[in-house]
Amino acid sequence: MAGTRGMIALAALAVLAPVAAAGADEPQPAQEQEQAEPLQVTVVLAHPDDELFMAPALAALARQGARVQIAYATQGDVGPGVSGLAPGKALGEVRLKEAFCAAEALGAASVASLNRGDGTLGVNAHHEGSSARKLLADLGLWLAETDMILTWGPDGGYGHADHRMVSAIVTQIAEARPAAERPKLLYVGIPAGSLPPVQEMADWAVTDPALLTENIAYTPADLEAAKAAAMCHVTQFDEASRKGMMGLFDATMWRGKVHFRPAF
């Protein structure tokens, strides 16, 4: 959510690592091996901290047994937030650590950084060698086996160009797949009339509730996981905002479930 600051590789892969792999190599009982494969959920976002916009839903999916993997198109290396750090590689490394912290809190299985340049996805997107073209190639391979994709809607939340481009690129990949192979693609949204009463979110996009036909309900424990994830993003939000953000979202735009609309 780069931009809401006072509130509240394949060679291209710079990072692709499990969040919690304890016991992963231990032999499993035969009956467990025979169980159906877990739901593969891929969350594609622009920057570390974007996951907060749907955080309790991710915790709920992981708790229910889904394998949740989070892919960030960039490391957020030009968004210092409240940190005072200079834009650049060092900031990106810190923000990626924050992303791992948040993913662990939410129970995600893995985090990937595609590292395609914060703030560059909309620059000459149709040109050969552009960040957008490279991201399209990255994700085309990376999304091949997923069952469900969660991402920004066309509005990008509050219109951030990187958010919009991530949504568009993911949609382009999904719409080209035959129906039998197409993953379920869901855009996260804010129901009209439910924006938090804070100035920093006054211009965020809202969606007609009639279109938000998919919802992921969460428990108090999932919300606590989301609160823990928010506390990871020290560079982006002051302490009061980190402590209060998830509770505010829960009381206004979520109310026990995160809202999505199907792309198709």
Residue ranges, per PLM feature:
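Sec/Tat signal peptide C-region and signal peptidase I cleavage site
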Residues: 20-23
